[in-house]
Amino acid sequence: MDLQTALAEIKRGTEEILIEDELVEKLKSGKKLKIKAGFDPTAPDLHLGHTVLINKMKTFQDLGHEVVFLIGDFTGMIGDPTGKNVTRKPLTREDVLANAETYKEQVFKILDPAKTTVAFNSTWMENLGAAGMIKLAARQTVARMLERDDFKKRYASGQSIAIHEFLYPLVQGWDSVALEADVELGGTDQRFNLLMGRELQKDEGQKPQTVIMTPLLEGTDGVQKMSKSLGNYIGITDAPNDMFGKIMSISDVLMWRYYDLLSGLSIAGINAQKERVEQGTNPRDIKIELAKELIARFHSEADAQAAHDDFIQRFQKKALPDEIPELTVTIEQDSILIANLLKEANLVASTSEAMRMIKQGAVKLNGEDKITDTKLEIAKGSTAIYQVGKRKFANITVA
């Protein structure tokens, strides 16, 4: 693969590269680069949002570079404060190691285990000792740490910041020194920590790593980042039928975002899919191909085909129209009453009409389940097809 094509694949779906010219020079050198991406095993199950970064690791792996999957068993016991307005509860060593094993099983559904180096940052951090940690802490100031957005907000609002939380970016940066990383991958929310690695490498006389930031993947609601707590996630260990249904529930616009960040298709392949839609192919068919690809990756080709067959059978049984309006209803609370949701979506003229239709059994969820509870609360982050009567349909996301 020529340099320009390789660079285009690396840049695909990335948010920012610091510094791109440095990356180009590293690629031109012909040297096998060491690509680092760190994961704190704070939760045992991965969802598709996590795989955006792992897919980028796979890109580098396919280009012949050395990929280091760094399990932050040491940092996991500190607790990453990124994006949090409260101090995270640290995990026990037993929790961290158990979660790390689950992580490895899951990432090797994407990465080639024979070409992946799995490292644990406790290897060097425990050897650093108390004196080494104090010397490391002396490299930065409290003022510098307070430049981090989450720390800044907590400090301004009078919320406590534990001293150990200031150490987290330094430890992550020191990982890059220990590994002599050429490139570090991370989400946009990790910017401060990733740049810390560059600073510490310079201090140690190493060439600073190139930082590549990937975006945070939106969940099935198309609004907020994919998260278990928001209920808008697609787990890579989800049952094939569940995964298929969730992928089919995303909007046609979000589908292309998922293709960009999750699909193994080349840029040319994705452009060919877009061309098919422009020439009249139903976007639903393109979405089906994406669902089958992802299920085959995390389960098997047979599971993907079975999930597809099940979906088609259920879809035809429901007799839903091919084109259903997609809309988002934004709420401030954690849930919305079903009658209010139907009114907001213009499926009924009033909440009283909604209540009446529910009592008559004329409101269905996803084409088959009748809604009979007038007090039903619909959770924020959910996406479903709502039907009122025989002719009114809407694919509604509550955000």
Curated annotation (Swiss-Prot):
Catalytic reaction equation(s): tRNA(Tyr) + L-tyrosine + ATP = L-tyrosyl-tRNA(Tyr) + AMP + diphosphate + H(+)
UniProt domain S4 RNA-binding: residue ranges: 336-398
SUPFAM superfamilies: Alpha-L RNA-binding motif, Nucleotidylyl transferase
Binding site for ATP: 228
CDD domains the UniProt entry points to: S4, TyrRS_core
Location of this chain's protein in the cell: Cytoplasm
Record-level GO BP terms: tyrosyl-tRNA aminoacylation
Domain of life: Bacteria
GO CC terms in record: cytosol
Stored Gene3D superfamilies: HUPs, RNA-binding S4 domain, Tyrosyl-Transfer RNA Synthetase
MF terms (GO), sorted A to Z: ATP binding; RNA binding; tyrosine-tRNA ligase activity
EC number: 6.1.1.1
Keywords assigned by UniProt, alphabetized: Aminoacyl-tRNA synthetase, ATP-binding, Cytoplasm, Ligase, Nucleotide-binding, Protein biosynthesis, RNA-binding
Homology family: Belongs to the class-I aminoacyl-tRNA synthetase family. TyrS type 2 subfamily.
Subunit and partners: Homodimer.
Protein name stated in the entry: Tyrosine--tRNA ligase 2
Species per Swiss-Prot/TrEMBL record: Pseudoalteromonas translucida (strain TAC 125)
Source organism phylogeny: Bacteria, Pseudomonadati, Pseudomonadota, Gammaproteobacteria, Alteromonadales
